[in-house]
């Protein structure tokens, strides 16, 4: 089968764990492969639960540089969208839910996290973004070593899985979704505001294939919905190196 032209194929990437180590900058060899091997062959986009500033830091650039470098940059699950270097669309969870509901959710999370005993706790337990509320039991200001320590304990004890279950039990009919993302946190957002949200920005682009690459593709992970959506061809990866290996095979690079 002949290759489709670049304008008809999109490679769409989660960031943490897919193109970069969690919350770390992209490796130079991964970046060179994406820019020199992949971009000449297909259109390339990013979709992340993080805000644009964090995405840009991980992509080793300023926000302006990164939105110009990629065909599409969907930060905060696509609630903030840039197409070909230009701002396109923005939604607000605060306007959607209202202040009372936002505070009800935040207060529950703070109380729940206050009763957890962990090896360490640091700062920024709740981060309010345009498209979601991010809650972090260990605190987002933890060091890299503390992050890894929490991730190891979480893998054994299911700290975030239990937290997610408590949220689902407390807010069963709220219209909210709760997804485990990255190594240390949970994303809270209105149902349908998961990473699939970015697909509405692609409906008129004429793509015949949208390949999505993510690492949190199991049910409950923040890549699951987009990975399993019938509009995408989902690829589950285990590391940036695995992402490159799969890209080489899929696109014959």
What is each stretch, according to the model?
Residues 2-7, 26-27, 189-253:
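Mg2+-dependent phosphoryl-transfer enzymes with acidic/Ser/Thr/Gly-rich catalytic loops
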Residues 4-25, 46, 73, 199, ...:
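Asp-based phosphoryl-transfer active-site loop
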Residues 5-12, 29-42, 170, 205, ...:
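A short, Lys/Arg-enriched amphipathic alpha-helix followed by its capping loop at the start of a domain
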Residues 11-16, 76-78, 84-85, 129, ...:
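Short loop/turn segments at strand-loop or loop-helix junctions that form parts
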Residues 25-124:
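Active-site phosphate-binding/coordination module
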Residues 37-59, 73, 125-137, 180-182, ...:
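Substrate-recognition element of Asp-dependent hydrolases with the DxDx(T/V) motif
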Residues 39-43, 173-177, 208, 230-232:
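A generic structural motif
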Residues 119-211:
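Conserved acidic, metal-coordinating active-site core of Asp-based
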């Amino acid at each position: 089968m002949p290759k489709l032209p670049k304008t008809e194929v999109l490679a769409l990437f989660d960031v943490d764990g897919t193109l970069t180590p969690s919350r770390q900058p992209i490796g130079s060899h991964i970046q060179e492969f994406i820019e020199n091997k992949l971009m000449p062959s297909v259109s390339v986009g990013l979709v992340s639960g993080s805000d644009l500033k964090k995405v840009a830091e991980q992509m080793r650039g300023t926000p302006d540089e990164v939105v110009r470098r990629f065909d599409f940059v969907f930060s905060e699950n696509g609630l903030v969208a840039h197409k070909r270097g230009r701002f396109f669309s923005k939604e607000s969870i605060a306007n959607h839910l209202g202040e009372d509901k936002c505070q009800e959710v935040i207060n529950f999370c703070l109380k729940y996290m206050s009763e957890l005993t962990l090896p360490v706790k640091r700062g920024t337990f709740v981060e309010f973004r345009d498209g979601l509320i991010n809650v972090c039991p260990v605190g987002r200001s933890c060091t890299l070593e503390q992050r890894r320590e929490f991730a190891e304990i979480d893998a054994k004890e299911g700290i975030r899985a239990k937290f997610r279950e408590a949220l689902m039990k407390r807010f069963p009919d709220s219209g909210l979704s709760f997804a485990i993302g990255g190594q240390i946190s949970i994303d809270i957002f209105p149902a349908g505001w998961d990473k699939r949200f970015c697909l509405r920005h692609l409906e008129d682009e004429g793509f015949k294939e949208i390949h999505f690459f993510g690492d949190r593709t199991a049910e409950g992970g923040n890549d699951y919905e987009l990975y399993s959506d019938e509009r995408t061809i989902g690829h589950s990866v285990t590391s940036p190196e695995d992402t490159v290996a799969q890209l080489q095979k899929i696109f014959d690079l």
